[in-house]
């Protein structure tokens, strides 16, 4: 290596140090607030309203100590009016949305069956889930239930704030291996991971540095465009390429053999699919047909006209309309509302014309209004600009005995600027 190359490397090093120092100074001087929650609002309203419809969600307890167990439970319905622009849930995985691994997920069940790989879900049916979480990082965290659907991406459900107290240093995650040895997954092979990061980063830096120290990328590109690659076929390049290729293969093979000798019994990543039967269809005497819907833009209100038929033996009354995790309730719905459900997702602006119950055997046209600023806060009014301007949600009714009936409703929605 000649003096010119050494000087070039020195200048590049100074540039790198200057950029690093400037970046550090910016992070120390500029006050950047961390993003804490509500990324789900960036998802399209038609995806949140008409794909997976969540209900009966619970987050317990409100405060969990490090190493203690918390749970997320609830149910979800796969809407019959599944959007055409969204991939069907033929391959779906139940997940948890959180700001980094603040909890460790211990187990997930769908309809009581352990679920740790993806599988098909049935449109038009319901599933009940339970997730057990072990508290890891202290703080106040926004926790979502979530379903990842192939060709559709993550579909986030409503979220609640879960608090973790204690010290992160006290966290442990012990498991027993097939050989009977107990290890702590929080710290197991940490030094080994650091070692391999250094090895591969070092090899990559050496590979790039070998070409940076010689004629730079831009001159090589100009020569290639002007004269072809004959002038660039340097014997040193071939020797260097073969040396790095052999070294890479040796590292991969050696690392594999070492791992086999240290850990002879391993379980491969599972590539099958989990087939979970949906919940049985509960008897529902209420039939609903949406005939008209509009969204009052200045009034922030969704108005729906429906034909409701009561085929049961008892009077039924509308109490709740839930969509995209937002629950619009009236007095009846409030009486059945879980007091621990996030207050920021509850709106009391549900009204029904007449407030008269639907009698057994009666078919009646009902006009419902769900009005609240949450349409704007949750960015659901953007459905007017969606490729499918349709709404969707779950309408809940109760009979005199307190039995709840759930109907998934959907329909085209028209924007208006005056009450029609």
Regions found by a protein language model. Name each.
Residues 262-420:
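C-terminal soluble domains/tails of integral membrane proteins
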Residues 162-198:
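Short, aromatic-rich amphipathic segments at membrane interfaces
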Residues 64-157:
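Membrane-proximal low-complexity regions enriched in glycine and acidic/polar residues
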Residues 152-162, 401-409:
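Beta-sandwich strand segments
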Residues 41-70, 282-290:
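N-terminal edge beta-strand
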Residues 52-55, 100-116, 336-352:
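Short beta-strand and strand-turn-strand segments in soluble, beta-rich domains
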Residues 233-261:
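Internal/C-terminal transmembrane anchor helices
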Residues 204-242:
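Juxtamembrane interface at the cytosolic side of transmembrane helices
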């Amino acid at each position: 290596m000649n003096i010119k190359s050494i000087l070039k490397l020195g200048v590049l090093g100074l540039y790198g140090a200057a950029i690093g120092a400037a970046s550090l100074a910016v992070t120390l001087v500029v006050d950047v607030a961390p993003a804490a929650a509500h990324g789900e609002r960036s998802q399209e309203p038609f995806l949140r309203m008409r794909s997976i419809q969540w209900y009966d969600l619970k987050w317990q307890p409100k405060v969990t100590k490090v190493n203690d167990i918390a749970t997320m439970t609830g149910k979800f319905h796969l809407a019959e009016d599944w959007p055409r622009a969204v991939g069907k849930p033929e391959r779906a995985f139940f997940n948890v949305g959180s700001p980094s691994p603040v909890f460790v997920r211990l187990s997930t069940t769908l309809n009581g069956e352990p679920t740790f790989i993806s599988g098909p879900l049935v449109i038009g049916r319901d599933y009940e889930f339970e997730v057990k979480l072990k508290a890891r990082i202290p703080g106040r965290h926004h926790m979502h239930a979530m379903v990842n659907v192939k060709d559709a991406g993550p579909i986030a459900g409503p979220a609640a704030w879960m608090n973790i107290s204690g010290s992160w240093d006290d966290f442990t995650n012990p498991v027993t291996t097939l050989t009977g040895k107990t290890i702590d997954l929080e710290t197991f092979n940490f030094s080994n991971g650091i070692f391999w990061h250094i090895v591969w980063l070092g090899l990559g830096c050496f590979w790039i540095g070998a070409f940076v120290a010689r004629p730079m990328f831009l001159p090589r590109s100009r020569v290639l465009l002007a004269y072809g690659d004959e002038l660039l076929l340097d014997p040193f390049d071939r020797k260097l390429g073969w040396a790095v290729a052999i070294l890479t293969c040796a590292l991969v093979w050696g690392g594999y053999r070492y791992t086999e000798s240290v850990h002879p019994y391993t379980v491969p990543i599972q590539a099958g699919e989990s087939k979970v039967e949906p919940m049985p269809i509960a008897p529902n005497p209420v039939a609903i047909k949406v005939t008209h819907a509009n969204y009052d833009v200045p009034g922030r209100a969704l108005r729906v006209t429906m034909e409701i038929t009561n085929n049961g033996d008892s009077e039924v009354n509308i109490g709740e309309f839930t969509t995209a995790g937002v629950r619009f309730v009236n007095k009846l719905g409030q009486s059945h509302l879980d007091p621990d459900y996030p207050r920021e997702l509850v709106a009391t602006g549900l009204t029904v014309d007449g407030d008269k119950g639907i009698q057994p055997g009666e078919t009646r046209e009902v006009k419902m209004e769900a009005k609240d600023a949450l349409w704007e806060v949750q960015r659901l009014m953007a459905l007017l600009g969606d490729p499918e301007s349709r709404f969707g949600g779950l309408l809940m009714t109760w009979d005199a005995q307190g039995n709840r009936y759930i109907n998934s409703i959907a329909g085209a929605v028209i924007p208006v600027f005056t009450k029609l």
